[in-house]
Amino acid sequence: MPVIKKEELSQKKDLESEEEDSGLEDEYEVEKVIKHRGKGKNIEFLVRWKGYGPEYDTWEPTENVASAEEAVAAYWETQDKTATAPRKRGRQEAYTASQTSITPKPESSKQAAKKARTSTAENGIKASVDKGEGNDGASDDDIDRQYSGSLDKYSDLKSWENVVQNIETVEQGEGGQLIVYATMKGGEKVTIPTELAYKKCPLKCLYFYQKHLKWRPVDENE
C-alpha cells in the first residue's frame, strides 16, 4: 500500500492533531480517492486516508498522490465504468505539448514532398483561455473560479460528446499533465484530465487540435 510522508501533505493540520493523540508514525496510507477538481493548471484529488474518517479527507495535488497509482487508477475506473483504468504510459508514450503535431507517415519521400504537413500554432497546444471571454491576463485563481464546475453528474455517461459544448484550451500543469478546459452545454466550465477527455469526448478533442493546427505547403525543393 502506498504511503505518503507527512511533510508532503498540503493539508495535514487535522491529521497531525489526530497523530499526536494516537502516536502514529509520520506516514499516511491512501485508502481511496473520493473525487477530483481543477486547481489552476493542475488536478487535485480528495483523498481518504487509511485509519481516518471522512472528516480527515484532504485535497492533494497530483504530485502528492504519485505513489498511490492503484488508488488513482481505481478512481478513474469509477468515472468510466465501461473502460479499463488508464495504464501507465512508458517513456516513449509520454505525452507532452510538443508532441501534439499531427504528422502522417509518408508512403514515400516523393509523395511526402507533395503533401501539406502540419505544425502546431506558435505557442503549441498550450494557449491562453479564449480572450473573447475576457480571460486575457487572468490569474490562476480567476481561472479556478471560472472552471470550477463538477463532473460528478456526468460520470455515469458512456460518452460526453453530446454534453461538451466546446473545448476552450488544453494546458500543461506544473506536474506535466495536460488538462482540458471545457464548457458544457449546461453552461458550466470544467477541467478534465486529458486521459479522461480522450475516452469520453475524443471527437471534441480532435476538433480542438485541428482548429489549432496551421497548414503550410511544403517547398518542392525540400
From Swiss-Prot:
Phenotype when the gene is knocked out: Mildly decreases methylation of the fifth carbon of cytosine (5mC) in DNA.
Compartment(s): Nucleus
Nucleus listed as a keyword: yes
Function, as annotated: Recognizes and binds histone H3 tails methylated at 'Lys-9', leading to epigenetic repression. Localizes DMT5 to heterochromatin characterized by trimethylation of histone H3 tails at 'Lys-9'.
Residue segments, region Disordered: 1-26, 77-147
Domain of life: Eukaryota
Main location: nucleus
Compositional bias per record (Acidic residues), positions renumbered to this chain: 16-26
Example GO biological process: chromatin remodeling
Organism for this UniProt entry: Cryptococcus neoformans var. grubii serotype A (strain H99 / ATCC 208821 / CBS 10515 / FGSC 9487) (Filobasidiella neoformans var. grubii)
Subunit record text: Interacts with DMT5.
Name of the featured protein: Chromatin-associated protein SWI6
InterPro entries: Chromo-like_dom_sf, Chromo/chromo_shadow_dom, Chromo_dom_subgr, Chromo_domain, Chromo_shadow_dom, Chromodomain_CS, Heterochromatin_chromo-domain
Comp. bias intervals (Basic and acidic residues): 1-15
One Pfam family cited in the UniProt record for this chain: Chromo
One cellular component term from this protein's GO annotations in UniProt: nucleus
Positions of the Chromo domain: 28-87
Keyword annotations: Nucleus
